[in-house]
Design a protein with these regions (language model features):
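N-terminal ligand-binding lobe of clamshell/alpha-beta domains
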Residues: 26-424
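Positively charged n-region of N-terminal signal peptides that target proteins for export
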Residues: 3-9
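Sec-dependent N-terminal signal peptides
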Residues: 9-18
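C-terminal motif of bacterial Sec signal peptides marking the signal peptidase cleavage site
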Residues: 21-24
């Protein structure tokens, strides 16, 4: 009898939650327009994220039940289709009060098409994280124990993640991490075994959904932060991620005490302050050297658009960039001939590579003989970073101030200190 009662209760709760998971978006709605009334948090730089907190007594309380409904609404704008939404998340605290909030919202939104919506019960204590920079951010926010599975383990430069992954299969190990395979084709069985409360991954244009992951009925957090063009805009997303998790350790069991939200807010404030300080200092110097990034891939040479994150970083470093007048916020696919025609006189060439020893000039010429036409090549002003050993992506994605400092040093010399990532 007890089992039957529990089964019925489970079905009822699932039904209430399912009412919030409506899969159709109303065309033409913007994130701001579709947000429910509440206290909208100011986002100074992020353009794709809207966060609305609900908890005002007059707005959400039910006098008859004596319930003060508390929840947070996070709306992600579609980066690839202006004026539409990619996803909505309703963050509801765990516990009895949260259960009542789930039921209340299910009643309120029982009709009407809405953007794809997931209810996320917080704090999330078990998650599969497909993206290395987000793993690093979780360590910085103090909620790393919520990482229970990762993808692309070989490409993650976080020693403790490697250490915990080595404990996978050890039943006596505390908080091991499971290797869930490639992010492009994750091991579904391993993810199911993790019993995650959320999955963090990077969305892509025209991806057509997430296949078997969609069928797990686990909230998929579409981390579209990388589509922000502003460096500080991407970093500001940590305010949202901080709301999902709790601090590790034995913090007092109050919502504010266990949440990573205050840590995320203070971390972003520190990053913003340092970034703006560096930008102001760089602006006080004469225009710096010209910088070319990346190298040829096949028959294409991908370079940052003028309004991309890297393009803006170069501008804020007061460096010269051959595509600084370009208006694109993404990458530009150029032919090597186009790059050489426009950037032959570039002063500094900086690029990333994965694995092995730094590439010598001889090796670079074996890759493409045209490199010798670059002034930076003939002068030996070549800077490289090995992303297989240096946590470049892990650290710079949410710490644009670190990359800004690198570009300032490349453009203006070592008056700002020594390079941390790039090596000559």
């Amino acid at each position: 009898i007890f089992c039957k009662i529990m089964k019925k209760l489970y079905i009822l709760l699932c039904g209430a939650t399912a009412a919030l998971l409506m899969a159709a978006c109303q065309g033409g709605k913007t994130a701001a327009a579709d947000a429910e009334a509440g206290d909208t948090l100011e986002m100074k730089y992020a353009k794709l994220l809207t966060i609305v907190k609900h908890g005002d007594v007059e707005e959400t309380s039910d006098a008859a039940e004596g319930v003060d409904y508390q929840y947070t609404e996070a709306i992600i704008a579609n980066p690839w289709k202006a004026g539409t939404m990619l996803h909505r998340y309703i963050l509801i605290p765990k516990g009895e009060e949260g259960d009542k909030t789930v039921a209340m919202l299910a009643r309120r939104h029982s009709t009407g098409a809405r953007c794809t919506t997931d209810t996320v019960r917080t704090p999330v204590e078990r998650s599969a994280v497909f993206i290395a920079p987000h793993c690093q951010l979780m360590y910085e926010m103090g909620c790393q124990q919520a990482i229970r599975g990762v993808c692309d383990l070989d490409y993650i430069n976080i020693p403790d993640v490697k250490k915990r992954a080595a404990l996978s299969g050890n039943t006596s190990a505390q908080n091991p991490i499971e290797d869930c395979g490639s992010s492009m084709a994750p091991d579904i069985e391993r993810i199911i075994a993790l019993n995650p409360e959320a999955i963090l991954l990077s969305p892509f244009e025209n991806s057509g959904g997430y296949g078997k992951l969609d069928k797990l009925h686990v909230p998929i957090i579409e981390a579209a932060d990388y589509m922000e063009s502003s460096p500080l805009g991407r970093a500001e997303w940590m305010k949202f991620y901080g709301m999902l998790f709790k601090k590790d350790g034995n913090a007092p069991k109050t919502a504010l005490a266990v949440s990573c939200e205050p840590k995320a807010d203070s971390l972003f404030a520190k990053i913003e302050k340092e970034y703006l300080k560096l930008k102001a200092e760089a602006a006080g110097y004469p225009k710096g050297l010209s910088i070319l990034t990346e190298r040829k891939t096949g028959n294409v040479w991908y370079v940052p658009g003028g309004q991309s994150t890297i393009g803006i970083l170069l501008e804020d470093a007061n460096a010269r960039y051959i595509f600084e007048d370009d208006e694109h916020s993404g990458s530009l696919a150029m032919s090597p001939e186009q790059i050489l025609a426009k950037g032959k006189q570039v002063d500094v060439w900086a690029f990333k590579y994965f694995g092995g020893a730094p590439l010598s000039q001889t090796q670079l010429l074996q890759e493409y003989d045209g490199y010798k036409a670059l002034a930076a090549f003939s002068r030996g002003n070549i800077y490289q970073v090995d992303t297989s050993t240096v946590p470049y992506f892990e650290l710079t994605s949410f710490h644009p101030e670190l990359l800004l400092r690198e570009f300032i040093i490349l453009a203006h010399g070592e008056r700002f200190g020594k390079l941390r990532f790039y090596k000559k």
